[in-house]
Amino acid sequence: MTVQTAPQIVKNYIGGEWVESISTKMEAVYNPATGEVIAQVPLSTKVDVEQAVSAANEAFKSWSKTAVPKRARILFKYQQLLVDNWEELAKLITIENGKSYNEAYGEVLRGIECVEFAAGAPTLMMGKQLPDIATGIESGMYRYPIGVIGGITPFNFPMMVPCWMFPLAIACGNTFVLKPSERTPLLAARLAELAEEAGLPKGVLNIVNGAHDVVNGLLEHKLVKAISFVGSQPVAEYVYKKGTENLKRVQALAGAKNHSIVLNDANLELATKQIISAAFGSAGERCMAASVVTVEEEIADQLVGRLVEEANKIVIGNGLDEDVFLGPVIRDNHKERTIGYIDSGVEQGATLVRDGREDTAVKGAGYFVGPTIFDHVTKEMKIWQDEIFAPVLSIVRVKSLDEAIEIANESRFANGACIYTDSGASVRQFRETIESGMLGVNVGVPAPMAFFPFSGWKDSFYGDLHANGTDGVEFYTRKKMLTSRWEK
């Protein structure tokens, strides 16, 4: 007899304890490759948020006074535990997010790198001094934590993005309340378990699962001093406005429409390889995905042919299968939304040279859309204007680098942009005139390492201090200035 087991119910992590939510409302967590329900996540309430913030605030009293080297040693141990559990974490990402195991494995690496950066807290927290600002007078600047931090993270990087946030925040002496995506809560829970194993005190890291009520609870709570958010543009704008209205520091990383410019002198083999990976990796569900390729007319036919040829070789399927490159999108409604954009591109006159809709019906119950490529796209089309967040690539033909930059700069998004060329002069012009925060030269995904800021512009970011790097340290700390007079 086969015994049917119910999907696990995800609990909140508050004050070092795994507790059930006050809410009885649940949302299913699916494996997007199979459509199978793998868990039930609570849609927690503001009461749950209150409990988590209270626990974090109480823990802040002692954690903020903990010696910085001791905080760093806990993070070093945490980093080693992440390394020791690397394969398990990657598999869990693939199961609840859908991306290929190889990509999930790489995501774990990026998360580990973030913890490594945060473990440098003794250096990161250093202040500055000037011994002689006047006769017998000296001044010094000291960094201090700011209190309870709220973090709201998306489904597309369930390990990397939380690791952008809470390791650096707690390294700086703050305590943290994390609201992971309700679509991918399992990885966040595992991160908390390993943090506890590393010796992180109770209440320093808390997790409240849910949706709108949890977000609003964090944005409105007086004891939450800052909010770090990653997600879609409309929600990012909402979080920034509501958070700042409640006098909080806010960094809100939003949507993207990243342009890749291919010039006549580009290495087309390299450009093709990089664009395919950047456009279709993680099923296009990342804010640094290559969404638009702007190519000079003389080489456009060659590039389009190469891209279609390589896209046809992509293996689509369950990310746990060894040869799979392209997994599913996150949910069935996102699959239908993507198909709607493909339909729109056809209706508005773009040339569909590779139709990913043809790959949706042969993969069983999962939420699959194949690599899709449009040629002869114009900036009036929705597929050029909107963040689709799916494996859909638009190709725009131009006469010059000037025209390519002009078109890219008309986008309201400005996360990343890339150029493929062997010309130093073209690279310099691109660097100086493109309106985008993260640039790549002959690379497809110019996402910076954890020790540099993730620096989107325009409607790709709301705030003053970006995630990661010294911007992150500034965001999670406040300063005291001490001026002293010492006379004999």
Swiss-Prot record:
Pfam families: Aldedh. Catalyzes the oxidation of malonate semialdehyde (MSA) and methylmalonate semialdehyde (MMSA) into acetyl-CoA and propanoyl-CoA, respectively. Is involved in a myo-inositol catabolic pathway. Bicarbonate, and not CO2, is the end-product of the enzymatic reaction. It catalyses: 3-oxopropanoate + NAD(+) + CoA + H2O = hydrogencarbonate + acetyl-CoA + NADH + H(+); 2-methyl-3-oxopropanoate + NAD(+) + CoA + H2O = propanoyl-CoA + hydrogencarbonate + NADH + H(+). The active site is at 287 (nucleophile). NCBIfam families: MMSDH (TIGR01722). NAD(+) binds at residues 155, 179, 182-183, 232, 387. Pathway: Polyol metabolism; myo-inositol degradation into acetyl-CoA; acetyl-CoA from myo-inositol: step 7/7. GO terms for biological process: inositol catabolic process; thymine catabolic process; valine catabolic process. Its EC number is 1.2.1.27. Belongs to the aldehyde dehydrogenase family. IolA subfamily. InterPro entries: Ald_DH/histidinol_DH, Ald_DH_C, Ald_DH_CS_CYS, Ald_DH_N, Aldehyde_DH_dom, MeMal-semiAld_DH, MSDH_GmP_bac. Keywords: NAD, Oxidoreductase. It comes from Bacillus cereus (strain ZK / E33L). The gene is iolA2. Homotetramer. One of its GO terms (molecular function) is malonate-semialdehyde dehydrogenase (acetylating) activity. This is Malonate-semialdehyde dehydrogenase 2.
